[in-house]
Amino acid sequence: LMKWRIFPYIFFFSIYKHVSRYNYEWILLQNHNYNKSKIVEITNSIFREYDIRGIYPEEINEEAVCYIAKAISIKCEQENIKEICVGRDGRVSGVSLLNALSDSLSKYGIKVVNIGLVTTPLLYFAAKKSDHKSGIMITGSHNPKNYNGIKLVINDKPVSGSEILKLISSKKQMSKNPAEIVDKDIKDDYISEVVENIKINSNRKIKIVIDCGN
């Protein structure tokens, strides 16, 4: 009888050792946005020093992004930011992740300016030129196509994944009146700015190399 009583603890300890060996800790969160009976698991490993990044959908997915959005809204509140630009790269998972992010930010009272499919520099340009100086890029960066993640700047300052991790379990009530989600095309403004800042002698012959990989 004693053997069977201690068996669950031995089993748990062996699982813990196996998980710890791969430095793979999980945050268990009650999902209030969708199904109250469902527990959402988010692995700590996606919260990096400079960004948030993981394999889709095992490590980062729409439900995880909803919790990340809540943490971002808390960070925005701390910085007195009420509006933020969002964009995505060309990964297939980017569309649904961006929609989940925008919807959650709106529900937590943050106005979302969706600039759509853009490069990361263009997202940073949009953030810099806006009054709120804040932006979120859905991108897996240089990683393979099954990855995706988030790069973040708030109030003209980069925000690390570890900062968001500290806020992920914090509580915040959803707004009774969700904030706006608006679409904006900023590509022409970006191109004009680039052209204005690059002076080329029209008499000089130049060679131009274009990398179309991304």
Language model regions located:
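N-terminal small/polar loop signature for handling phosphorylated ligands or for N-terminal nucleophile
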Residues: 83-147
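An N-terminal, well-structured beta->alpha segment
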Residues: 38-103, 107-108, 183-208, 212
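Hydrophobic alpha-helical signal peptides and transmembrane signal-/tail-anchor segments
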Residues: 8-15
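Gly/Ser/Thr-enriched, mixed-charge loops and adjacent short helices
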Residues: 148-214
